Amino acid sequence: MPLRLDIKRKLTARSDRVKSVDLHPTEPWMLASLYNGSVCVWNHETQTLVKTFEVCDLPVRAAKFVARKNWVVTGADDMQIRVFNYNTLERVHMFEAHSDYIRCIAVHPTQPFILTSSDDMLIKLWDWDKKWSCSQVFEGHTHYVMQIVINPKDNNQFASASLDRTIKVWQLGSSSPNFTLEGHEKGVNCIDYYSGGDKPYLISGADDRLVKIWDYQNKTCVQTLEGHAQNVSCASFHPELPIIITGSEDGTVRIWHSSTYRLESTLNYGMERVWCVASLRGSNNVALGCDEGSIIVKLGREEPAMSMDANGKIIWAKHSEVQQANLKAMGNAEIKDGERLPLAVKDMGSCEIYPQTIQHNPNGRFVVVCGDGEYIIYTAMALRNKSFGSAQEFAWAHDSSEYAIRESNSVVKIFKNFKEKKSFKPDFGAESIYGGFLLGVRSVNGLAFYDWDNTELIRRIEIQPKHIFWSGSGELVCIATEESFFILKYLSEKVLAAQETHEGVTEDGIEDAFEVLGEIQEIVKTGLWVGDCFIYTSSVNRLNYYVGGEIVTIAHLDRTMYLLGYIPKDNRLYLGDKELNIVSYSLLVSVLEYQTAVMRRDFSMADKVLPTIPKEQRTRVAHFLEKQGFKQQALTVSTDPEHRFELALQLGELKIAYQLAVEAESEQKWKQLAELAISKCQFGLAQECLHHAQDYGGLLLLATASGNANMVNKLAEGAERDGKNNVAFMSYFLQGKVDACLELLIRTGRLPEAAFLARTYLPSQVSRVVKLWRENLSKVNQKAAESLADPTEYENLFPGLKEAFVVEEWVKETHADLWPAKQHPLVTPNEERNVMEEAKGFQPSRSTAQQELDGKPASPTPVIVASHTANKEEKSLLELEVDLDNLELEDIDTTDINLDEDILDD
């Protein structure tokens, strides 16, 4: 089987002819030098052009990043080397390097050197620490030197390719070549070193349309790759994947297996001739330069070949080398969430195939390595070969001794104890297989689950899965697709019953085999089950777990991570990245066990687990209980006062809510509790809550609704003391204390309103208020103040005022007492009364009458106003409390003092 290389185009940048490309080691940038004299920097993540350097008017055939100096170094047909700062776009240095076109630049990985090659047949070494002086010249080629590359395993050695049909290997410090490789029939355009430690290989491409692999120790050609129809312009060993990439003037890019030399894939993006290729260690990105622009493609799987067993032993593949690390060896070292673990790595040996995936079997005794269309099962301890074979795919069963392979797109074989047990052909073919409690087979028609023992169809589901994860008990399964994931419950008892009776069995299997528990619109990258909790990493780099319909975020990851496993005794979850770094995050097994018990409605088990959960984690558990509908248990478990208060309100637990409100001393909480108390008809508690909340509007509503005159009176005093003047005014007014309303308006500077109130309800006070109004207004507008008319001075402007004095006295004497509410039906409404008629024959006292006739208003009735002393402010709540549950409606003031104004007219 060919390598399973996913090839995705990440960037297409249209431009003039591209002569060289380079990738930045840390930024998502691609550097492209163009035939028109420009150099561009593209961001391949955002698909945008981020920087442009106008170098010259001639072709720029070479450009390289020098990341440690923030430089871009260019070489052009004007023979000049230019150095730019890619942050400021400033040109740092420029000098003439050769006497002909500059073909290639190579940057030394550790020293302050660059190597340049040219059509003048020379290679030169430049030292930027010595003001860009030429440290050495390498002579020997007899034609253009097309490319130079430094040996990644020996930085003092480099190789060069020339149109003189030779490849020369040089040593820094020696002006003559170490040796020359000959074999191409035409000029050699490109060269590259193999970066792995197992092969001393070089690759070259030439105008004879051939690609040759050389052993530079034995100085022999070990392989020739044929296939291109035109000159081979670029050739490269990928630094991470076991592939060779070649590009040609025939417009194609060919990908070859670096071990078998088999052609794996041919790419043609329709951008004419391919001139250059660049790749980067630690990345699967490959940059290509063509006549019509540049392209970045992503090759292969990002997911590393890595696996961990239940005891914390991790095995991974670094190229073809298999290594092991043991979490137990860390002992009691302090581990912080998200930090790289300092693991001791042990080499286990080399694998005969290039591992694309590594996976332990369920009990951890064996590990399977898959790649190159083959699988090898090793013992996990010593990496001894136990079994092997050809397969496109491999899957372990839940039974550790059983596994399946996909031999082709139509045949699946099942093995037991390393011996073939059964072979079958799924009805609709087999594009992929999945292990677990049932054997999953994906086809063009969807997903089919089969019984491991007899390969009977259990259920066919119209879904195209990407991953399938089974829980340890086999009751739950997660099916992850490209856009979402589904949680299903496997009903094994119904399956057994259907297999015995054959009831409910259709051509799509057993109808009741699965029950859908939920669908979540999130992309799962990797996942595993702990109990009934599904833990997964998402496409947006979040580490979450799903339980009972709730998604809990454990951590936000700063890069793509892959789940390895969970160690219950450590209470930690372990993940790895593509650089084989291992990190961990805390996840308490007690929390997961509790949530699992709740999901199974096993509350006795949940109660046993609860004491083992730390207090700081209990609120998280309480939120889970609340979402499951168990609010009473959530109230008991939660330690967050805010959460407990909300739950107490929802459950109507007045006592608990009251205690929490007392502790919180929050006005908002008192208001919320007051609403609940009113809904529960607990008016005494509601009054206390409203008082704590200083909600005078609410207290007024409560007092008036209950007809509690004493409460209204006390409320008026308290509201005035605290500056709640509107409530104070309304409270006085409802009690018929119009004189107190008047004094309140005067004290608060509302003199116009006071004047109109006096004219309507207290005619005897009009003159006094007008004088105060005039005095106050004169400070602002003297003319306006003089226009105000005082009744004592302009009696003709206030007809009927004397009669109003009499009516006022009559009202004071006849309406002084409160009437019981039971007399309300006997009281005539204001709109049906004529107070002037009712007051006929009334004789006011001599003193009051004489004052009125003399034009002097009677002294105002004293108004009792709450003092501002500390004693008044600290009144006990007991003074405001009233037993509203046993309320008698005897003391409601039904005296209507809102006299219509028309009764004061003549």
From Swiss-Prot:
Sequence positions bearing Phosphoserine: 859
Ranges in a coiled coil: 866-890
Residue ranges of WD repeats: 13-52, 55-94, 97-136, 140-180, 183-224, 227-266, 350-388, 390-425, 746-783
UniProt keyword annotations, A-Z: Acetylation, Coiled coil, Cytoplasm, Cytoplasmic vesicle, ER-Golgi transport, Golgi apparatus, Membrane, Phosphoprotein, Protein transport, Repeat, Transport, WD repeat
GO CC annotations, alphabetized: COPI vesicle coat; cytosol; Golgi membrane
InterPro entries on file: Beta-prop_COPA/B_2nd, Coatomer_complex_subunit, COPB2, G-protein_beta_WD-40_rep, TPR_COPA_B, WD40/YVTN_repeat-like_dom_sf, WD40_repeat_dom_sf, WD40_rpt
GO molecular function: structural molecule activity
Entry's Gene Ontology BP terms: endoplasmic reticulum to Golgi vesicle-mediated transport; intra-Golgi vesicle-mediated transport; intracellular protein transport; retrograde vesicle-mediated transport, Golgi to endoplasmic reticulum
Entry annotated with the keyword Transcription regulation: no
Positions of post-translational N6-acetyllysine modification: 627
Family assignment from sequence similarity: Belongs to the WD repeat COPB2 family.
Protein name: Coatomer subunit beta'
Species annotation: Macaca fascicularis (Crab-eating macaque)
